[in-house]
Amino acid sequence: MALELILVLSSLIVILIIFFSFKSNGKSENKLAKLPPGQMGWPFIGQTIPFMQPHSSASLGLFMDQNIAKYGRIFRTNLLAKPTIVSADPDFNRYILQNEGRLFENSCPTSIKEIMGPWSMLALAGDIHREMRSIAVNFMSNVKLRTYFLPDIEQQAIKVLASWENTPEAFSAQEQGKKFAFNLMVKHLMSMDPGMPETEKLRTEYHAFMKGMASIPLNLPGTAYRKALQSRSIILKIMGQKLDERIRQVRDGCEGLEQDDLLASVSKHPHLTKEQILDLILSMLFAGHETSSAAIALAIYFLDSCPKAAQQLREEHVEIARQKAERGETGLNWDDYKQMEFTHCVINETLRLGNIVKFLHRKTLKDVQFKGYDIPCGWEVVTIISAAHLDPSVYDEPQRYNPWRWQNISATASKNNSIMSFSGGPRLCPGAELAKLEMAVFLHHLVRKFHWELAEHDYPVSFPFLGFPKGLPIKVRPLEKSEA
């Protein structure tokens, strides 16, 4: 009897959801006659499933292609049970990002908030987001990049690439990029040394955490999402111990404390709670690790497909190394980095075609009008930032990897065209320059040490995060002495 009652109540709930879904959709569409065209899809789930289908990161995907062909670059749908405007219009996307806090606000999915934490920069808006972002910006300022980050980036790159020597079998370039980025971030966030037991423990839990980020958000025993929440607790415990240790050392007046890591930065904000600090550290580990590791893997992938670019890149770095040797200098400096002109073209093109971040979630704070369309207050807005990178009206042959296109674009135009790679407006990624610096330094040593080729076919896939289905397996062979 109890089971029958549960079934009846469950059926009634489903019917009510469907009824109110249709009813609310109908009201929304009748209220404003100039909503963007589109369809809401199935009741409740809408078009979430086709929207989230994996596809090549160098494309918009079948869902976007079909809807753009049918409705144009701005259309309406239902994603994650919410009425949503999807924009592949570069002008509208920039308008959205530039009006953050006035017409639009960040709208992080609930599942991401739960796994990243309520104080993660991904989830915050308003004054608290500005404060957290200010900490991140100061931590990764140009001065810090030159004096604090650059030497360690080079040291970690040399260490990772040294492990590739005498390795005849194929290995995952994606995993090597992740190892490089992770070791670098934990050292600069919390002064944790690579290879130490607590660092390896953190890395193991972080990988489980990331698998849950890319899973269906079902908090049930055995699911990747549940395991990710458990890993989050372990990660925060490890980070909390490091924070408590630093606070104790400062209180006891210990000498020789690290003054440049993130723990030192947050100690200057005593009003922040421990929970806020730990969520900030975790969100910065996530942002710094995922962006940089993906960018390095993409560069390896695209350069393999474009030998001419790889050779020109190699020639640039061999020449930089030769000039440094003549001056008796060791170790890269900021002037060397600025001298890497073709390298910056490679970086821009890799970010453009690779599309590490495909879209952003926003929500309207008031009724918005744009290009003749009315967008109601409270609606979700998904900006497809990769659309500008693949727009033939902006880039000739946008599907082709062509670093030389950036040689003909002024610095201002380059900034305007590439800024979407790292979001924009008040939420522009504070680690954008750090990611580019990591790419440049890694490539400087990679192209002077090795030739490489894909061991088997693989390609970058979007959704929910960028990755290579096979891990980007490569084989390497050392350069001849005459080439280096």
Curated annotation (Swiss-Prot):
It is an enzyme of class 1 (oxidoreductase). It is found in: Membrane. Expressed in roots. The keyword Metal-binding applies. Involved in the biosynthesis of steroidal saponins and alkaloids natural products from cholesterol such as spirostane-type saponins and polyphyllins, compounds with pharmacological activity. PANTHER family: CYTOCHROME P450 26, STEROID (22S)-HYDROXYLASE. Belongs to the cytochrome P450 family. This is Cholesterol 22-hydroxylase CYP90B27. It comes from Paris polyphylla.
